Amino acid sequence: MSLFDFFKNKGSAATATDRLKLILAKERTLNLPYMEEMRKEIIAVIQKYTKSSDIHFKTLDGNQSVETIEVEIILPK
């Protein structure tokens, strides 16, 4: 993959694939009853120490036994 390929528009098939991955990731988290509570606790701790309200969670692709969640925090200046 070259640098120029990074800026090309994705085709509809690639976009549909990405959307399906998001749906499947969300369905996997629905099976874990503690996941939403854990997210709320993480947000509370982050807000306590950073005073940031701009926090985003993203579920990353993992294998079937491990789920990875990425947290993006936008810190105020």
UniProtKB/Swiss-Prot annotation:
The gene is minE. Keywords: Cell cycle, Cell division. Belongs to the MinE family. It comes from the Bacteria. This is Cell division topological specificity factor. The keyword Ubl conjugation does not apply. Pfam families: MinE. Prevents the cell division inhibition by proteins MinC and MinD at internal division sites while permitting inhibition at polar sites. This ensures cell division at the proper site by restricting the formation of a division septum at the midpoint of the long axis of the cell. Gene3D superfamilies: Cell division topological specificity factor MinE (3.30.1070.10). GO terms for biological process: cell division; regulation of division septum assembly. The keyword Oxidoreductase does not apply.
